[in-house]
């Protein structure tokens, strides 16, 4: 460990591992350290022994749940958008050679006490039970505008300036009811809350197009998921880094960030060893004095022995409960997966519920999600702070990632990756097709 590196990375969360892989490919000498004995941090997938050690220390796991190795339990309910930024990064870096993906079978939204499939295009909107006949026509016209809008053709604008007109005013122009606005804004554009309504319409249109293009890629739903769990993602990028010379040290305590007299970080101490580097990346847990809390998340991991009710017995689903449907300020997300994803034994299913904490009783806030699951075999819940760095890292050369957030996908995470990459290198991350490993 007593060597000099270009970059030291602390923690093997997905943000850290993507950056480690990208910087290694760029020719940087990278040392990657994690205090845990497993990859992934908050993006990890744990076996049963690890799961019980984290949530119920000292308690033995039930033998009835089968072999440890048959379980890969995610800590967060996230899926990849099939046409999203993380998927593109995986393809361009050739990390897809290490990871096999399976499509999520259905995308649902909670409305008026029941769940229904989210329409992915104009034709599905016409068949949706979420809307009345006349509302379906209005929704179809709105989605046609989203799809047909062209910057170079004013005839497609429909008297809408997407950089000036708010999304609220656009919905009003098309005469869409509040319930329809809910599933478009929250189940298609995937917003956490209603702040987007007051903002210009461009971003919402782009988000709906991402949803639609992701569905168009494979059909059924816009989401894909790695076999053996989300923990495969950081491990895939760690392998990329290692192939390009990166050094990995798991189960390695980090005792101190070492700074020079000018306050700039120069290395990391573990015991009596010091590794030096020009730049340091890390998750918030390694920089407690340099981050602030911006909220809290409550999550529940539930083991079921049946599919989630009212989802056509599908092996995998996402369910979004829009805030207004349960008188909240933030949505509730449910990710459901099963043995076909190699994350649990046959006959079992996993459902993970998540939302942003709004009250003094966080567990009561996920109750609407729990009600949709039916009988639960085991459940594990916890509340976590959401952290973000207080500075951009350019002065002290400590580049800190944001906590894994409440969104149901990875688009915000890749925004953080791109932002940190630019601050560290001074250049935008440009995705160039990497040579295939066998070609090198």
Curated annotation (Swiss-Prot):
Q: Where are the transmembrane segments?
A: none
Keywords, in A-Z order: Protein transport, Transport
Pfam families to which the protein is assigned, alphabetical: GDI
Tell me the GO molecular function terms: Rab GDP-dissociation inhibitor activity
The protein, known as: Probable secretory pathway GDP dissociation inhibitor 1
The species this protein was found in: Schizosaccharomyces pombe (strain 972 / ATCC 24843) (Fission yeast)
Which PANTHER family does this chain map to? RAB GDP DISSOCIATION INHIBITOR, RAB GDP-DISSOCIATION INHIBITOR
> Which family does the UniProt entry place this protein in?
Belongs to the Rab GDI family.
Q: Which GO terms describe its biological process?
A: intracellular protein transport; small GTPase-mediated signal transduction; vesicle-mediated transport
Say if the entry is tagged with keyword Protein transport: yes
């Amino acid at each position: 460990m007593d060597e000099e590196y270009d970059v030291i990375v602390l923690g093997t969360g997905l943000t850290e591992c993507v950056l480690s892989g990208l910087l290694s490919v760029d020719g940087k000498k990278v040392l990657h350290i994690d205090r845990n004995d497993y990859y992934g941090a908050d993006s990890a997938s744990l076996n049963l022994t690890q799961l019980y050690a984290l949530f119920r220390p000292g308690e033995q796991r039930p033998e009835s749940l089968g072999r440890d190795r048959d379980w890969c339990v995610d800590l967060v309910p996230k899926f990849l958008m099939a046409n999203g930024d993380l998927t593109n990064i995986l393809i361009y870096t050739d990390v897809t050679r290490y990871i096999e993906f399976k499509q999520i079978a259905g995308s649902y939204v909670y409305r008026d006490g029941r769940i229904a499939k989210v329409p992915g295009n104009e034709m599905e909107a016409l068949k949706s039970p979420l809307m009345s006949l006349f509302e379906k026509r209005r929704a179809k016209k709105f989605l046609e505008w989203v799809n047909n809008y062209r910057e170079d053709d004013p005839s497609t604008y429909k008297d809408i300036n997407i950089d000036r007109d708010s999304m609220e005013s656009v919905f009003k122009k098309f005469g869409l009811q509040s319930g329809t606005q809910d599933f478009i804004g929250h189940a298609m554009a995937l917003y956490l809350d209603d702040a987007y309504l007051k903002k210009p319409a461009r971003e919402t249109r782009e988000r709906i197009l991402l949803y639609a293009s992701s569905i168009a890629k494979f059909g059924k739903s816009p989401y894909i998921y790695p076999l053996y769990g989300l923990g495969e993602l950081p491990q895939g990028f760690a392998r990329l880094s290692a192939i390009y010379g990166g050094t990995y040290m798991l189960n390695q305590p980090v005792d101190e960030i070492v700074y020079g007299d000018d306050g700039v970080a120069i290395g990391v101490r573990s015991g009596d060893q010091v590794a030096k580097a020009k730049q340091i990346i890390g998750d918030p847990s390694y920089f407690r004095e340099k981050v602030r809390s911006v909220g809290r998340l409550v999550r529940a991991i539930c083991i079921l022995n049946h599919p989630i009710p009212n989802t056509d017995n599908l092996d995998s689903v996402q369910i979004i409960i829009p805030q207004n449907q349960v008188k909240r300020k933030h949505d509730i997300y449910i990710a459901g997966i099963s043995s076909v994803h190699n994350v649990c034994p046959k006959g079992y299913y996993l459902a993970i519920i998540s939302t942003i904490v709004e009250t003094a009783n966080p567990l009561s806030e996920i109750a609407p999600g729990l009600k949709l699951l039916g009988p639960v075999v085991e459940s594990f819940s916890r509340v976590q702070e959401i952290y973000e760095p207080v500075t951009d890292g350019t002065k002290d050369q400590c580049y800190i990632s944001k906590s894994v957030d409440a969104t149901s996908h990875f688009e915000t995470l890749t925004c953080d990756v791109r932002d940190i990459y630019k601050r560290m290198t001074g250049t935008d991350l440009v995705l160039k097709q990497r040579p295939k490993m066998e070609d090198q």
